[in-house]
Amino acid sequence: MCVLCVCWAAAAAMAAGPVPVEEMNPSYVYVGPVGDGGWTYMQDAGRVKVDADFPGLKSTIVESVPEGPAVVPVLEKLIRQNKSKLIFACTFGYMDFVLDVAQKYPDVTFMHVSGYKRADNVGTMFGRMYQPRYLSGLVAGSMSKSGNIGYVAAHPIPEVIRMINAFALGVRKVNPAATVKVVWLFSWLDPGKEKEAAKALIDSGCDVLAMHADTGAVAQACEEAKVYVVGYNNDMSQYAPTMHLTAPIWNWEKLFAPVVQQVADGTWKSEAVWAGMKEGAVDLAPFGSAVPEEVRKRVEDDRAKIVSGEWDVFTGPIKDQKGEVRVKEGTTMSDPDIWSMNWFVEGISGEIPQ
């Protein structure tokens, strides 16, 4: 299997020697339930595919582990009782606690999803989700008649901010006068709050909604109100069969499988893995029936440029909310700058809480 990674940080160190697949006992720690229909659902779908691809591999999952110190005893138990030699910690808020536990168990390999801190036996992984986010913005901008587009967002962290920015860049590429209105949830998974935020955006005049949350609640609200919606994580057309336009989606097996192979081979090293559409780690869900052929063609044309490496989303000129140029024409943001993004692009209505 190929190693699907783009690394801007130097490798810290090689892990321990080869670990036979039969003895690896990989564990996956999830922030939500497998049945959330989104983030955790897709991560577990990836796990299942990886298990099927490696004969003898038997994985363990722990669901609904809150971000914060609650993850520590879970990790300890997986190492001591489950004898896990590889652990995937699958949400941003586990970061510092994974590092603390990893210090005590140097012979265990940890991969932290969405984080940026590494150690000799701790790597990080994520996908270039901003790429399909931009493409979904092209769709949303094309389908909005009012130019008022809502975005239900989880937490004000760089992961979410760069997604909103990429989406807004896509929206305004085809609808230059459009505005993307952001509402913060301060939660990854809260169906009630997600639906409430969606209804508030619809009531404010938004005729297309996008989302960065873990369930299908926003899509359900849009279906009920007959407002177009762009999903996230998974193809969410099941929640909005007539109003779902498309969704940026994850193929987590493309991230998990290379790590399993490397640990088995004894070639794993601590690094930042960031795979994109080219590697198949992220993509765009099928278009809904409402999306016209000319919009589909525009999206496919830009998709081809991204996959080929001819062009990427954060290529200038790009201005921020204040109208100041942040990315000059002819230049593209570096990976570290994209990863640490803490400002909104022009055309976004809303603030980033400090």
PLM features: what roles do these ranges have?
Residues 1-12:
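Bacterial N-terminal signal peptides
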Residues 16-354:
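A residue-level marker of the well-folded mature domains of exported/periplasmic proteins
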